[in-house]
């Protein structure tokens, strides 16, 4: 099953890191967040990806062109027109196929998905997620849930951590508990979607996929939510970037479900 990764946004709230590269190329533990997402899907035997590029697309293209030459020794035979051999073949992602598609600098999310329709056959089911969110969601259980209902779309729904402290008080307004972080009670769409080919019928030119396309699918009663109570964290701010790197450096990254 192919997976679309939306990787074309500007990342304007993380200008410290995204001035010269797109947000999916911002590194966590020395690896782009895009790599972490690929590793998660690969853990569940998902091997085909379509990366929808836009802002600073050259950075993504160059990363994949150079992928096999990163982090390993290279042997170059200068007598044979610079014949190149990689001394240590990477074990990670070595059987993965990635299509890099330029979907425009200012395209909305729905438009980016619409532009890669050509890479799918009629009737094909596929997945989609965002290039800046990490989770330990069980991809196989997500697929199984999608196949269990008659809708054409499933998104993963989670209760995110509040950015504010959460307090509880008694009848006299005495504070009885104070948590630095609490969870918002309403669930949100965190990506990690499974979509049927018919969803393309709902995408109009330059649609916002979340605010327009999915609303139309939901109004036709064809959209379902897969509840996820585990870890999810977007990288929307510099503070979140620092926190994700701190978790990785301490070997406490909840999204790292694969083995080294």
Explain the meaning of each model-derived region.
Residues 33-36, 112-115, 213:
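Well-ordered alpha-helical segments embedded in enzymatic catalytic cores
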Residues 3-5, 51, 128, 153-156, ...:
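Structural beta-sheet core signal
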Residues 25, 166-169, 214, 225:
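A structural signal for short hydrophobic beta-strand segments in well-ordered beta-sheet cores
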């Amino acid at each position: 099953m192919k997976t679309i990764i939306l990787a074309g946004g500007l990342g304007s709230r993380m200008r410290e890191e995204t001035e010269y590269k797109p947000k999916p190329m911002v590194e966590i533990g020395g690896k782009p967040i895009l790599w972490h997402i690929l590793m998660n899907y690969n853990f569940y035997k998902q091997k085909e990806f379509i990366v929808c590029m836009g802002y600073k697309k050259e950075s993504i293209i160059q990363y994949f062109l150079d992928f096999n030459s990163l982090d390993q020794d290279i042997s170059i035979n200068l007598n044979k027109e610079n014949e190149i051999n990689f001394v240590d073949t990477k074990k990670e992602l070595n059987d993965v196929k990635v299509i890099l598609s330029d979907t425009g600098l200012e395209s909305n999310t729905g438009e980016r998905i619409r532009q890669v329709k050509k890479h799918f056959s009629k009737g094909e089911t596929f997945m989609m997620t965002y290039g800046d969110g990490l989770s330990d969601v069980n991809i196989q259980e997500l697929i199984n849930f999608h196949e269990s209902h008659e809708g054409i779309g499933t998104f993963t729904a989670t209760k995110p951590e509040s950015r504010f402290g959460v307090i509880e008080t008694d009848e006299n307004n005495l504070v009885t508990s104070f948590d630095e972080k609490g969870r918002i009670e309403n669930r949100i769409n965190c990506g990690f979607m499974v979509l049927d080919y018919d969803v393309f019928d709902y995408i109009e030119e330059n649609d916002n996929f979340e605010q327009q396309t999915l609303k139309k699918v939901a109004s036709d009663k064809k959209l379902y939510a897969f509840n996820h109570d585990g870890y999810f964290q977007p990288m929307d701010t510099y503070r979140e970037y620092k926190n994700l790197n701190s978790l990785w450096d301490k070997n406490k990254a909840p999204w790292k479900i694969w083995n080294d």
